[in-house]
C-alpha cells in the first residue's frame, strides 16, 4: 500500500461511498491495501516471471473531475490485453472509464540465453560462486533495450531487500564487488569471451 492508497482508505472510513465519489470508492474496494490485484480479478502467478503487481500511481480530484493512474506489472504468462479487459470490467461496476496511458510488455530473457550465460560466468569468475538468477517486475532501464539487455545486480545471496525503502543502501564492499563483476562482464562482451572460457 502506498501513500495515495492509504489516503483513499482513510477517506473511505470517514465518509460514505457517495461522499468520496466513484473513483475513491473503486480504489478502496478494488485495491485497498492489496498489491496482487486479487479484488480486481487480476491475481496471477507465473513460475517464470513472478506475480502480477498493482499499485495506485496517483489520484487527482478537482471539482467534479477525478483521475487515477494504476501501475500494473504483469507476468509473461498473460497479455496486456487480458489485463486491460479485466481492469475495465472491474471499473465498469463503478461507472468509470478506463484508458491505457502507457504500456510496456514485461521483459523476460531465458536463463539459457547467451547474454545470461555470459553475465553468470562473469559473476562466477569474480565471486567463485554460482549466481542465483531471478526476475522482478521492476520497470528498469533494461526494458528500453528491446530484449537485448537486462538489469544486472547488485543483489547478493542473503542480502536484506531494502530496494525503494527510506534506508535503501548497499554495503561498500559489495558495491566494489558488483563493480568488479560489471567490469568482468563488459570485458567478456568486448572480447567475445563465452561462458565456457575463463
Predicted regions and their residues:
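Active-site proximal loops enriched in glycine and acidic residues that flank catalytic Cys/His/Asp
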Residues: 58, 70-74, 100-102, 135, ...
Amino acid at each position: 500500500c502506498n501513500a495515495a492508497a492509504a489516503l483513499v482508505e482513510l477517506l473511505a472510513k470517514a465518509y460514505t461511498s457517495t461522499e468520496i465519489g466513484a473513483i475513491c470508492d473503486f480504489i478502496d474496494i478494488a485495491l485497498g491495501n492489496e498489491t496482487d490485484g486479487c479484488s480486481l480479478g487480476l491475481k496471477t502467478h507465473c513460475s517464470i516471471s513472478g506475480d502480477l503487481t498493482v499499485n495506485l500511481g496517483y489520484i487527482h480530484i478537482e471539482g467534479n473531475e477525478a483521475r487515477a493512474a494504476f501501475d500494473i506489472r504483469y507476468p509473461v504468462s498473460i497479455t496486456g490485453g487480458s489485463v486491460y479487459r479485466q481492469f475495465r470490467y472491474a471499473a465498469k461496476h463503478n461507472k468509470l472509464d478506463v484508458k491505457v496511458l502507457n504500456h510496456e510488455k514485461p521483459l523476460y530473457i531465458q536463463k539459457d540465453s547467451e547474454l545470461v550465460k555470459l553475465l553468470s560466468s562473469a559473476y562466477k569468475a569474480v565471486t567463485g560462486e554460482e549466481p542465483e538468477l531471478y526476475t522482478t517486475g521492476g520497470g528498469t532501464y533494461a526494458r528500453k533495450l528491446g530484449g537485448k539487455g537486462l538489469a544486472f545486480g547488485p543483489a547478493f545471496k542473503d542480502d536484506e531487500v531494502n530496494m525503494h525503502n527510506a534506508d535503501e543502501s548497499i554495503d561498500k564492499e559489495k558495491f566494489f564487488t558488483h563493480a568488479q563483476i560489471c567490469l568482468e562482464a563488459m570485458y567478456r562482451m568486448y572480447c567475445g569471451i563465452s561462458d565456457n572460457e575463463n
